[in-house]
Amino acid sequence: MRACVLVHVLTMVGFALGKAPVASVRTCHLCFLEDPSIGCISGSEKCTISSSSPCMVITIYQNVKVRFHVRGCGQHHSFRCQENHVIYYSDYWYRVNCCQYDYCNSWSSAQHQSTLPGPPGNHLGVPLSESQIKQFYQALHLPLFQPDLHTHKVSEGPDSLILPPGLGLSIADLRKIYLFLNSSGLLVLPQARP
């Protein structure tokens, strides 16, 4: 009997000593505007948070149709995971999914596909160009965050920012949604880079 207890204790000690150290930060995918069919339109990045906080996928619906996804770093409010909640407009609402390991909020589709499956009109649009992505972040006035893009002057004219018509929201409405998600304790907005 004592030998059996000793074996169990030694086994437990062996497992405890053999565990890998837990990282102090978690890395998540970051995308502010993802079409469910074609992937991240707004430029894909990554974000880091404390290891006690989750990676998030926030799905924005209009009535029962998925309009877009937001992927990013969540704040430590795990009770909010799997929550459904109405935003600003009676026909828009969100659903939150959380996960607790690096890059667990993976993409729902291949990124930046050149051909779109399904009939035209079912997608938000093609990925934005680098200058459009820069304009997108500037127009949102998010906390001075700019994605890792090659430095160049943002051009006006044919390459200027036009949100995908299938989205059905303005830049101002998107900004309200992102700030709401941040202030409600769901999404951590990236900070300015030095």
UniProtKB/Swiss-Prot annotation:
Glycosylation (residues): 182
Source taxon at top rank: Eukaryota
One GO MF term attached to the UniProt entry: identical protein binding
Keyword field: Disulfide bond, Glycoprotein, Secreted, Signal
Signal peptide from the UniProt entry: 1-18
Subcellular location: Secreted
Residue ranges occupied by any UPAR/Ly6 domain in the UniProt entry: 26-118
Post-translational modification: N-glycosylated.
Cystines in this chain: 28-55, 31-40, 47-73, 81-98, 99-104
Name by which UniProt lists this protein: Lymphocyte antigen 6 complex locus protein G5b
Species in which this protein is naturally found: Rattus norvegicus (Rat)
